[in-house]
């Protein structure tokens, strides 16, 4: 059985986590093995890098490099092996978040992010070679990317209200509203650039309505009954 790689995107407060858990239960009820993971993170090394990225001050290039370093380890140790096994991989954020937060939010060069994406996410040595050899050439033809990205689209103003008093914010959650407006625009731009991969969900709706919309995306693809 072929593996499925599904990512979930949206600004903080959009409600991704609840629906990721619901989808994991739905896939398991159909007998599928599920790998639940997140970014930055997903491995011991990547979780250490996550803590640095979320809490330590650094320049934008350092931040981007740490995120992609965490992503490479995550791909090598978790995502690629799970896909080879035939698992359904449900990942809370992936590269689209980097383009939205670091690119649109921080104003980091999108061309540099695209180059890092090509290098780090090359499928050479991951889906075919268990050794995970790194491709020592810049011309990478294919990259590992989600089969589907579920984007929980929520206005930044509404997200801010949901997060009030929820927890101590990390350095991203503590950013001003204008930052999240740029991030939301970044997600919209990514959807427009990859319409075949993105499924936009109106996350402003009641939770049960959002869940039905999410589930219907998977039913329509024949992945859930």
Curated annotation (Swiss-Prot):
Keyword terms, alphabetized: ATP-binding, Kinase, Nucleotide biosynthesis, Nucleotide-binding, Transferase
One Pfam family here: Thymidylate_kin
HAMAP family in alphabetical order: Thymidylate_kinase
GO biological process: dTDP biosynthetic process; dTTP biosynthetic process; dUDP biosynthetic process
Catalytic activity annotation: dTMP + ATP = dTDP + ADP
NCBIfam families: DTMP_kinase
Keyword Repeat included in the entry's annotation: no
Binding site for ATP: 10-17
Family: Belongs to the thymidylate kinase family.
Classification via SUPFAM superfamilies: P-loop containing nucleoside triphosphate hydrolases
One GO cellular component, as annotated: cytosol
Molecular function as annotated in GO: ATP binding; dTMP kinase activity
EC number: 2.7.4.9
Biological role: Phosphorylation of dTMP to form dTDP in both de novo and salvage pathways of dTTP synthesis.
Protein known as: Thymidylate kinase
UniProt xrefs under InterPro entries: P-loop_NTPase, Thymidylate_kin-like_dom, Thymidylate_kinase
Superkingdom assignment: Bacteria
């Amino acid at each position: 059985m072929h593996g499925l790689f599904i990512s979930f995107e949206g600004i903080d407060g959009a409600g991704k986590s609840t629906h990721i858990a619901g989808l994991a239960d739905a896939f398991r009820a159909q007998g599928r093995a599920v790998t639940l993971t997140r970014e930055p993170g997903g491995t011991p090394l990547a979780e250490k890098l996550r803590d640095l990225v979320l809490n330590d001050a650094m320049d934008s290039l350092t931040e981007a490099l740490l995120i992609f370093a965490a992503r490479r380890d995550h791909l090598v140790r978790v995502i690629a092996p799970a896909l080879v096994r035939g698992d359904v991989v449900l990942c809370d954020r992936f590269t689209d978040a980097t383009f939205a937060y670091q690119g649109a939010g921080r104003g980091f060069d999108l061309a540099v992010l695209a180059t890092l994406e090509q290098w780090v996410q090359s499928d050479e040595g991951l889906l075919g070679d268990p050794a995970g050899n790194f491709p020592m050439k810049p011309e990478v033809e294919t990259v590992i990317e989600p089969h589907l990205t579920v984007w929980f689209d929520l206005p930044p103003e509404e997200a801010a209200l949901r997060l009030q008093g929820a927890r101590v914010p990390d350095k991203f959650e503590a950013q001003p509203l204008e930052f999240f407006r740029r991030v939301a625009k970044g997600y919209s731009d990514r959807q427009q650039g990859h319409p075949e991969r993105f499924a936009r969900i109106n996350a402003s709706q009641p939770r049960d309505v959002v869940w039905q919309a999410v589930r219907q995306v998977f039913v329509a693809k024949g992945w859930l009954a």
